[in-house]
A protein has these predicted regions:
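HDAC/HDAC-like amidohydrolase catalytic core signature
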Residues: 1-247
Length: 247
């Protein structure tokens, strides 16, 4: 955090530690956050121990907007980042995190921005038009040892799958060149055409192809659930992605 002084009153603390005001804390929040992280860790352990090639961790609340010192965007702690660090400490020399949620994974980026052992790639709505607004631009490429290991693909409103998948193919090529030991996918179904708070135009059948392309990398893959707000469709879109990941 750039400011050295933490306010004493509660509204000030919320403004200091929260990147946005929509992420409320209530009875049961801490238990849910802890359980969500444990789901990601269980998935990471299953991958790291070689028990499975693909694991889906249905994490709620999500995590990719949370950094070391800020929460927000419905995220409190970063499940994907915790899983990546666990993999690093349990046999993986390099880990790649591919974030395909509609919103930029600003928290994941911040956590690994100065590291070369975790490659972070994010496909998302252009932050000029979408949350989190202040991060997710193409010129954010990492810092220090992490220079070149952060890759952002901001995309315009109304982007259809045939344009979106061009960015995915570029990201997949970068992952293949990086040659990680394991892959984490931060999956959000809010890229769907009828998602109420997003502006991409992916259709339900597109998620089959998305999963299949990622599967072609042949990497042990942990999928961690992030966003998705078209309530009637989030289930089928997630299932379609997971089916594609097994193809």
């Amino acid at each position: 955090m750039p400011a050295p002084h933490v306010p004493d009153f509660i509204d000030g603390k919320i403004g200091y530690y929260a990147l946005a005001g929509e992420t409320s804390i209530s009875e049961g929040t801490i238990e849910a956050v802890r359980a969500s992280a444990q789901v990601a860790l269980t998935g990471a352990d299953t991958i790291a121990s070689g028990q499975a090639q693909h694991i889906f961790s249905l994490c709620r609340p999500p995590g990719h907007h949370a950094s070391r010192d800020q929460y927000g965007g419905y995220c409190f702690i970063n499940n994907a980042a915790i899983a990546a660090q666990y993999m690093r400490e349990n046999g993986a020399a390099k880990v790649a995190i591919l974030d395909v949620d509609f919103h930029h994974g600003n928290g994941t980026q911040a956590i690994f921005y100065d590291r070369a052992d975790v490659l972070f790639l994010s496909l998302h709505g252009d932050p000029k038009h979408a949350f989190p607004h202040f991060l997710g631009y193409a010129d954010e490429v990492g810092h220090g040892k992490g220079d070149g290991y952060n890759i952002n693909y901001p995309m315009a409103p109304q982007t259809p799958y045939d344009k979106w998948v061009e960015a995915l193919d570029h990201a997949i090529a970068s992952i293949r060149s990086y040659a990680p030991d394991s892959l984490i996918v931060s999956f959000g179904a809010d890229t769907f055409e009828h998602d109420p708070i997003s502006f991409f135009k992916l259709k339900s059948d597109d998620y089959f192809d998305m999963g299949a392309r990622i599967n072609a990398l042949g990497l042990p893959t942990l999928t961690v659930m992030e966003g998705g707000y078209a309530v009637k469709d989030i289930g089928i879109n997630t299932v379609n992605f997971l089916i594609g990941l097994e193809r």
